[in-house]
Amino acid sequence: VKSFERPQTGERAVLVRLGLGTPVDTEDLQEFRQLATSAGAIPVATVTGRRDRPDPRYFMGSGKAEELRDVAVANEAEVVLVDHALSPSQERNLEKLTGRRVLDRSGLILDIFAQRARSFEGKLQVELAQLKHISTRLVRGWTHLERQSGGIGMRGPGETQLETDRRLIGQRVKILTKRLEKITQQRETGRQARAEIPVPSLALVGYTNAGKSTLFRSWTGADAYVADQLFATLDPTVRRITLPGGTLVVGADTVGFIRELPHELVAAFQSTLTEAREATLLLHVIDASDARRDEHIAQVDAVLAEIGAENIPQILVYNKIDRLAVQPRIDRNADGQATAVWISAEKRLGLDLLAAAVAERLTRFARKARIRIQPSGGAVRSRLYEAKAVRAEHPGEDGSSELDVELPDVELMTLARTPGVQILDVPGTPLPESLAFQASPPVKSAAGDF
């Protein structure tokens, strides 16, 4: 699928950012400049302004739009990048006025994702998101699309180019959706196979450019792509990690988040983000040197909630402490539980503390529980005995077993997602929300309570 018949895109860009009811936020503008640079653009000028509300025609007022046109001409800009979500009509009107291609924030992020995707799945996800975004912006021809298709007597010369474009996009969306469904099924099959012998899993999440991939590479030795740019990583990398004490976990590096992440991308990357949604523990990596780190934490948590990962336990990992006068350390809550670790992945400072904190979260604060394992779950049963987590076993007449175990919440969560395993009861303390969906009412048995 080729591009629109629009003014040709180049690298020289004018950036646009308005303050809606407030002055322009310089930090937001700087982040948008980073986005533009990450996309390969060369910012040559910036147009800012302030309005109470967006203008229906240009988003900005007509006077500011004319100023934008003059700035673009004077600086020989070839593209206009707007740090807001534009409606299709606003985008078209600005293109007609300026004679330049216009991309809003969503379009720019989609373009970056298109450049960064390396795996077959990642490329399909990005293309699907782009087509859904573009489909709302069709006005006149993608004249270089594939030839018109249609059966005899079905679609003749009366079909307009716009109708053809919409139909071809619709067909491509269906094809991509089916391919991604197959990949998702394959990924789920692999995940279920790993779950047969449950191993705790970690997912690195965080705001883009917080240093997740640097940490992942420093910690695991994995060949994860590292660059000082936004969205350097799109495709998840999964590796085994051995923690202090010999505990084996699976770690996954995931795509970074950002404010106003286009909904099309969140939807398209659902299967990839499953690595975070189904993790035992999240390592929420934060740029400790960023003045807006608390805002970034909130924005990442909002995306985690959108994908259904808000109840997964977290350790906050404050990275890049080499830029601050801060020593590596572990922060704890009132119960003594490790809640945050301060490190520098690039300088390899505090990585031992992080590994210790993760191992601690996976092994400390155990609670008693009763679980039922079906006859097919022999590997799970063996692993629980090897971990010395079994306190008693009560064989069932159907070949299943009820085990009284003592495990931390994060490992109970792993068991709750394991085929052939059912959480029956966690007495004495409230059941975590993450386990409640799996639990059954307490079962009376001859074995009695524990």
Task: Name these PLM-found stretches.
Residues V1, R187, A193-P200, S218-V250, ...:
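Switch I (effector-binding) loop of TRAFAC-class P-loop GTPase G-domains
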Residues V1-G19, D28, R33, K132, ...:
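C-terminal-of-GTPase-core extension/linker across diverse P-loop GTPases
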Residues V1-R105, I109-L110, I423-L424, T429-F450:
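N-terminal accessory targeting/assembly segments
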Residues G19-V24, R53-Y58, R116-E121, Q161, ...:
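Flexible beta-alpha connector loops of hexameric P-loop NTPases
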Residues E27-S38, I42, A65-A74, V79, ...:
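Conserved C-terminal guanine-recognition region of P-loop GTPase G domains, centered on the G4
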Residues S106-L110, L230-F231, E346-K347:
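Short, acidic/turn-prone active-site loops that include or flank metal/cofactor-
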Residues G107-L128:
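Short alpha-helix plus adjacent loop in nuclease-associated cores
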Residues D111-R116, D235, L351-L353, E433-L435:
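Short, charged, surface-exposed secondary-structure boundary motifs
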